[in-house]
From Swiss-Prot:
Family: Belongs to the WD repeat WDR53 family.
UniProt gene name: wdr53
Region (Disordered): 207-231
Higher taxonomy: Eukaryota, Amoebozoa, Evosea, Eumycetozoa, Dictyostelia
SUPFAM superfamilies (UniProt xref): WD40 repeat-like
Protein's name according to its UniProt entry: WD repeat-containing protein 53 homolog
Swiss-Prot/TrEMBL keywords: Repeat, WD repeat
PROSITE patterns membership: WD_REPEATS_1, WD_REPEATS_2, WD_REPEATS_REGION
Naturally occurring in which organism (per UniProt): Dictyostelium discoideum
Amino acid sequence: MTSVDINNNNNNNNNSNSNIIETKLIGHKDTVLCISSHNKKEIIASGSDDCTVRIWDLNTNKSIQSIVEGFQGNPVNNVCFDQDFTLYCSYDNIIVSFDLRQPNVILKEFNTQYKFNTEEINQLSFDSKYQYLAACDDSGQTKIIDVTKNKLVESLNKKHTNIATGCVFRPNSKNELITSSMDFSIIHWDFLKAKVLHRDTFKEGSLPQNISKSQQQQQETTEPNRMLNPPFVTSVDCSNNSKYVAISMGDGTIVINEISSFKQYLKINSIHKSSIQQVHYPKYLENNYQRLISFGNYDKKIVIWDVSEDMNTKVSSSLLSNDEKNNERIKTWLEHSEKINCLTTSNLKNNAIFVADLSNDLKLLSIQ
């Protein structure tokens, strides 16, 4: 474990408008792909390209358990805690669970295995009661699993026409789920009936013809106002008051909808110089609907936005340009040293962001 004060380290590539302390959680032997925080215990889990999972103690920032078998030599793409002692992990199209009460430091045997998805799983998500586990995949489908009965209860299919990038349950609702897709849409479901309650489709942009991936990446970095990606939806997250869903898109835009009406609450034409990889409501805030975290795909910039009603009133009544309005909304920003895979927060650790990037080390960013 090493700590760095980003603002005072001349050899670090990070830039920030706040004092950020970076702590490295060292243990994985390859790129960290995913992270999950426990809602009741001061632990987090991380999955890696090294085909293992590690459990970390937030008090010491050290690994206390590792799962080294059960993934058939595959990278672990998703991890998700239940409310007690079980960790669910996915690799390829398979989900396996592990009982963390085992006294062993190294775990090798899983408890349950689910093979309901047909293609690679992109996100795992629990409902508020931790009865239903959602798993969305590359086929565009989302499987709903009742983990108390170990059975598939519903398949949400034939509505998304491309990769399903995200799935999140509406907090404290009985049967509501929101999914996102590369088909430029998000869907609000009654997941127990496989019924579409709302759908929002974002206008498809146009891509230049005959452009290579490297050219696209370079142009995203050097020409922030010329987005080459269409607005495919890359992620979704719900606020803890159950009122809002935040949406990140490939054209660098953030949209927040009111869930009940599915009408647009606000739109941010982002300062990110690339597509936005993820949006996340910080779990450490009691009223987290007032703040939103985002990061870009290639620009490596992490931004904490003020999306409160007071700020909306302020910027909507001003004569500022879009860029100036964005600057008004920004509470904290930093440029990370590596391309980021994902991030999360914990309701048990204030002002802290956990970042999985292309390095082997999990990063804890403490905002001072």
